[in-house]
Each structure stands twice: as structure tokens, then as C-alpha cells.
Amino acid sequence: MQNINIRENGLTVEFGIREDGIVELLDFTAEDVANAKTTPTDPEAIFPVVEVQVTGKTTRHMHAYKHNAGSASLDFRYDTHSLKETANGKELVLQMKTGYGLEAAYHMQFFNGIPVVRTWTVLTNAGTGNIGLEYVSSFIYQGVSGNGGQSYYKKTEIYVPNNSWSDEAQWNKHAASDLNLTGMETDGFNCPGFGMNRFWYGSNSSWSTCEYLPMGYAQDTETGEM
């Protein structure tokens, strides 16, 4: 496996390029904490850096309402990458291609002086036929609360910023298990070791912050990471 390692503004970021060309985000942690690389127990488990659902394509496994199992995600293979300086800080761009004309550019923008990134994905149809898209991820990482010895659903707290008119930024703390983010005790034997459920919040229409602010964070109560 080829690796892309970046240490920038207090962040440790590592991408892995598998022998088949699929790119995975292996590590995304603060420099001062132990390494929390994604280490799936199933050797056939693949965590692509971009999740895409193409109309007519199937899914890789059970996923319920989560958008992390589109079979088209495994069609994207590494092409090139660049790390360039911008006015705000360094920007990584990973270029990936499929065999049917759909191409992806995964961007990770670092910011000078703070351990924060902004990520987004640009898809381009370089082929001759129409391609239907149902969703594309902007950021996906399998290693949240990956340090320590406890399972994520037993130690993760999720902070949600409720919002309203003249009642802004009302942060609320929830245990992962209280949000139905539980795990499976069995990992293997056709069981993935993690639950099928998602936790979602957001807004629509012209008032983007009507009920929630577009932010949030998770804390690992075992290690103190946020």
C-alpha cells in the first residue's frame, strides 16, 4: 500500500492507496494523541475516501439510511495528487477516475495556525453518456473515537447546536447510545460489528439555521479527544 502522510497545523493525516487503486483515509487525528488508524477486522472491508451513489448501481452491504455503501464508490481509482500552498494554507487534491468516465477530485484545505480542515468533492462526467447521481460525500472517516479500548458507542458524546430566533447556539450533549448509535456485539459472520443507524440533523429552505447551526462535534470520553 502506498501512503500519503501530511502533518500540518497540529493534525496528522494519512491516506492509503490500496494495490487496486482505491484510496482510504486511514488517520485523521491531532498530533498529540495516539494513532487511531482505521484497522478493520475484516480484511475485505474497504473504506473509500469518497462515497458516491450512482443511479442503477447497487450497494456493497446493509446500510439502512446511511450513505456509506454505494458500490460505485469502489470504482474510483487513484490517478494523481497534489499539495499546494494557498492564501489560507496548504490544499491537498486527490484525483480519482473510474472506467466509465466519472472522475472525482477530493479537496482537503488546511488553514494556517489552526488544526481545522475543509473538505469537498467535485465530480466530473468525462464520458459520453449521462450518469445519474443520488449522493456524494464531502467528508467520511471511519476512525472517530478510534483510540482507547472501549467501543465508540460506549464512550462517544455528540454535541448538537440547537438554534432559533433569539435563542441561538444552545449546545446539547448526547451519548451516542441515546441517539440509537449502538453497535453489534458480533463482528464477523455476516455482521459488520457496527450498527445500521445514523444520526442526522439539518435545515432546508432559505433559513439555513432555523433549527440547528451547521456544525457539531464528537468527544471521546475515554481519551478526551474532540
Show the residue positions of the predicted features.
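Polysaccharide-binding surfaces and accessory modules of carbohydrate-active proteins
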Residues: 4-226
